[in-house]
Amino acid sequence: MPTKTVVENDVEIIMPKLYKVMLLNDDYTTFDFVIEILKTVFHKNEEEAINITLKVDREGSAAVGVYPYEIAQVKIEKTHTLARQAGYPLRAVMEEV
């Protein structure tokens, strides 16, 4: 999924495509759980996690981070697994940047 090739000192570097991970709002997942996901899965600090959670609640979705495809996919899967285990319908999606 490379998007850009750069040649430096006769070494070809292929830059991966990047994907924005978004959290989607629902009527059941608690603020505390979303904040915990943001801190543990996405490594956000408390203030960042609260701000993102409020944006998800107000606007219906919010960007959490930008990652190469494989990393974005793993973070989404981890979010869905933890949400299911806790009994919440929290969803995350990705879109190409």
UniProtKB/Swiss-Prot annotation:
Pfam families: ClpS
SUPFAM superfamilies with a match to the protein in the record: ClpS-like (SSF54736)
Domain of life: Bacteria
Any GO BP: proteolysis
Role description: Involved in the modulation of the specificity of the ClpAP-mediated ATP-dependent protein degradation.
Subunit structure comment from the entry: Binds to the N-terminal domain of the chaperone ClpA.
Family of the protein in this entry: Belongs to the ClpS family.
Protein name as it appears in the record: ATP-dependent Clp protease adapter protein ClpS
Native source organism of the sequence: Nautilia profundicola (strain ATCC BAA-1463 / DSM 18972 / AmH)
Organism lineage: Bacteria, Pseudomonadati, Campylobacterota, Epsilonproteobacteria, Nautiliales
